[in-house]
Amino acid sequence: MLRMKLPLKPTHPAEPPPEAEEPEADARPGAKAPSRRRRDCRPPPPPPPPAGPSRGPLPPPPPPRGLGPPVAGGAAAGAGMPGGGGGPSAALREQERVYEWFGLVLGSAQRLEFMCGLLDLCNPLELRFLGSCLEDLARKDYHYLRDSEAKANGLSDPGPLADFREPAVRSRLIVYLALLGSENREAAGRLHRLLPQVDSVLKSLRAARGEGSRGGAEDERGEDGDGEQDAEKDGSGPEGGIVEPRVGGGLGSRAQEELLLLFTMASLHPAFSFHQRVTLREHLERLRAALRGGPEDAEVEVEPCKFAGPRAQNNSAHGDYMQNNESSLIEQAPIPQDGLTVAPHRAQREAVHIEKIMLKGVQRKRADKYWEYTFKVNWSDLSVTTVTKTHQELQEFLLKLPKELSSETFDKTILRALNQGSLKREERRHPDLEPILRQLFSSSSQAFLQSQKVHSFFQSISSDSLHSINNLQSSLKTSKILEHLKEDSSEASSQEEDVLQHAIIHKKHTGKSPIVNNIGTSCSPLDGLTMQYSEQNGIVDWRKQSCTTIQHPEHCVTSADQHSAEKRSLSSINKKKGKPQTEKEKIKKTDNRLNSRINGIRLSTPQHAHGGTVKDVNLDIGSGHDTCGETSSESYSSPSSPRHDGRESFESEEEKDRDTDSNSEDSGNPSTTRFTGYGSVNQTVTVKPPVQIASLGNENGNLLEDPLNSPKYQHISFMPTLHCVMHNGAQKSEVVVPAPKPADGKTIGMLVPSPVAISAIRESANSTPVGILGPTACTGESEKHLELLASPLPIPSTFLPHSSTPALHLTVQRLKLPPPQGSSESCTVNIPQQPPGSLSIASPNTAFIPIHNPGSFPGSPVATTDPITKSASQVVGLNQMVPQIEGNTGTVPQPTNVKVVLPAAGLSAAQPPASYPLPGSPLAAGVLPSQNSSVLSTAATSPQPASAGISQAQATVPPAVPTHTPGPAPSPSPALTHSTAQSDSTSYISAVGNTNANGTVVPPQQMGSGPCGSCGRRCSCGTNGNLQLNSYYYPNPMPGPMYRVPSFFTLPSICNGSYLNQAHQSNGNQLPFFLPQTPYANGLVHDPVMGSQANYGMQQMAGFGRFYPVYPAPNVVANTSGSGPKKNGNVSCYNCGVSGHYAQDCKQSSMEANQQGTYRLRYAPPLPPSNDTLDSAD
């Protein structure tokens, strides 16, 4: 790390960083640490003044244990940080400070723990890159460390290493731990048994504590040149730049540092089991407490410190630059450095006191009713903090002061000042308010300043709201697991980036500005869901519009127009409920422009059907006026956990009980739906169970109210999480209601899993498209169509749980929508350029296009340039597959052309390639064939795109589409192969094996280009001849959290079992394997171009199996034809480059013999005497 900053040194030679001077003086090998480095629960002596010329306030030493780089005070404070405004030169200086702090100040244990915490914050691609860099750096010292690595990972017993007081024993244990493999559990178990018992270490410390004076003399003798060897043998002496005062007695500073390093490495090593690491972390905390404050603190596990967790294992550093519950902004963190541990903040607060409080200013944001007061607090340790308090907080604090801290004059002054703050905005006298408060705090007594109440009010981190960030590395891992289990989100790397910080925005009914509370998360996941309440007029406000941002808290935006829209919606609550329908429609038009975040639908108590309405069920989805990101690309990466919305309206419970009989009265119910999650949902449709609602229309023939004001719902147990909510139900086939045209509506694309029946969809005015599959379809025509994407066939388990019925009849409604007002460049055309009024029913297997860039659509525009998609989805007319039903009173308005796009698995493979247009015949609602229905199929090579209802682009690629014969298809043209292989937009392949009318499976058609099992894309690194519908797990096309279940049956192979390309495979046989669904959109797999190497072969590895069940494929047998990977092709020597053996078996001389690193073992002990029994190699 120091090597990285060397080019930056000559840039600013005259400005050495202020932090670097004193830590260098403190951390220089052999230096004596000052007494302020010792920190325990008792107040330490005051710190000594700085040695050099004064540069303003004493800059705080860097935080211990590597949990936060130092930030200079004064003018350079935060200059290189975001918002610091210091320019590039200031950023370079801050970078140099971090390098020097890391390399010169921290010891080995602190560096390792700090680096492990940083690695937990990296995403998978960054980790892979860092792994490559580490491999290159570690290769230089491989030959020197090879023997020690073999001993550490070998099967032989390393021998007796029980006496931790011997430097050679500690050295050998540290070397073994450093060279232990990450998966060698057996060797890790042996090392775990060899680690010193912490009780023995503590007992040794307690036994030698009474001989502290003699130990101190030995310490000083160990720092002399003559006593170096004696101190080395005794375990004393300087080490690692961290020298502690001799509180341990018998163990010197070097021995203490080595023991800390030993337990730190063991507690972080991945080869140890979880239980072992937790136990070792407890031992490490006990050891730190003993070295800090004596054995009596270690026996009670630091409980006198009252650190925010109940156990000492939770005693890890907080971020020293964190906002507290009152939005306190810490300019400097007044925490002295400790080389061994982190002192609790309670000890810090007891050790320092407030010397001066100054009111910096009074300000008001937006249309707030109250002021905010900013105070500058000077502490006794020369640190300065800036604390911002609201009027209510300041009023509560001042009125609750004890009598000994106030007087009659003080009380009168307080009341006068607070009355100014509570007046209306136009009646306030701001010039009078600020001087009163400034004089009040500047003339306060020492008893007032040193009071515990004043101290806790102005402290940097509140004891009430402080959630300890304990054990940074393990806490991050715990949070990752919890986020995966709660939300099953595919953005696992995003969840790790800002898991330390939750931004909770709390808006109140009175229009008070949002209070942003950045608090530390705790080890318990429930502590992060901090709820805040405010009482106004006796009514508890439960409106917690909180968005817990995991990745980008800065995207949590509350715009002014949404704020005003919320005020309008709230004002409509207090009006009379019996207002006309048209007036409510106007209110909805103003309030319906929602930009919500989607997550799972949390449904509560069971519902009771009363005619056409439902009563007393709360669909906990809440209002969406606060957005997290204005675009789908911003908000889809910010998942949120579902929350119970206990929102209360201003109505009484009796009024709510009476409000059960009319659908039109439900529009006044403020219990709106809350979405948290991914797309920008502006078009909202609701879902109801299909068996409990007789009709969705009211007496006027209209649909139900907008779902934002709709009645409540019950939990739908069999349905996976939807990204939109639809009014659903077993609607009678004769009830068909056309939807009104919105003002600026756009085409809607929806995911409808099979167990859901679509009966009616209501749109509201001023609504923008549903962000379901990314940008929705925009074709630029005057009338747009609604596409219901639903499948009567078994669909992949991404969309359907096991207990659902895959074949379900759907009722299809035709909607005409006005033209869009946005640019078609940012829209995805699901089935492009259809005639006006056309209606499409497609399977998710044929119409899903994953959007990797929701803002704009890269690559070829749609699947129309994809010959593979058209070969798998046949286009048939509805007059051949939908029987005419007599006696239907209500039908869909006659469309110009109606088509159904179904996978070829549901069609016959031997029908003539003809198209069947449906010229405006009535379509019965809810009649679609099931899986084994006898239907006709047409080839997608039909040259009549107008009559078949498909676009021009679909009909212009006949060479790439298979014919009606079940034989292999002709190879596509090179241009088409290139376009389909390189396009990311059409990576959803629906090539399936055909199924005839009797249900027998026809052999699948061979295709020239399709999804590859090696890389997941359509490439040339392997054949995909026997591609089948359910043989491949595609990435989730929707970025939201869906409940993923394993496949219905075991899956065959889709690619040969090696990276050899087509030229190296003789007969096309393949090795079956199971490819589980990866949690990321594109798994990190090997580069497919490696398949061009003749001797390269690698068996396809199983995917990410940490959170998903992995089932092995049956009949996994190796190829006997010789086309599979050769045995000698799996291993290669990186030393000589020849295949067939590993590097450790290589007979050639090393290629890097002349470039070996100069690193030598740091902890190698001195040469033992001749009569010593230790191995000379150690």
Curated annotation (Swiss-Prot):
Pfam families: Vts1, zf-CCHC
Biased composition (Pro residues): 43-67, 959-973
Listed InterPro entries: PX_dom_sf (IPR036871), ZCCHC2 (IPR042793), Znf_CCHC (IPR001878), Znf_CCHC_sf (IPR036875)
Phosphoserine modified-residue sites: S236
TM regions (residue ranges): none
Protein name: Zinc finger CCHC domain-containing protein 2
Polar residues bias: start-end ranges: 595-607, 665-683, 974-986
Ranges of compositional bias, category Basic and acidic residues: 208-219, 580-594, 642-661
Bias-annotated ranges (Gly residues): 75-88
GO terms assigned for molecular function: nucleic acid binding; phosphatidylinositol binding; zinc ion binding
Record region (Disordered): 1-90, 207-249, 557-683, 936-986
Classification lineage: Eukaryota, Metazoa, Chordata, Craniata, Vertebrata
Chain intervals with Low complexity compositional bias: 632-641, 937-948
Record gene name: ZCCHC2
Source superkingdom: Eukaryota
Organism for this UniProt entry: Homo sapiens (Human)
Positions annotated as zinc finger (CCHC-type): 1131-1148
GO cellular component, one term: cytoplasm
SUPFAM superfamilies the UniProt entry points to: PX domain, Retrovirus zinc finger-like domains
Listed Acidic residues bias regions: 220-229
Gene3D superfamilies registered for this protein in UniProt: Phox-like domain, Zinc finger, CCHC-type
This protein's UniProt keywords: Metal-binding, Phosphoprotein, Zinc, Zinc-finger
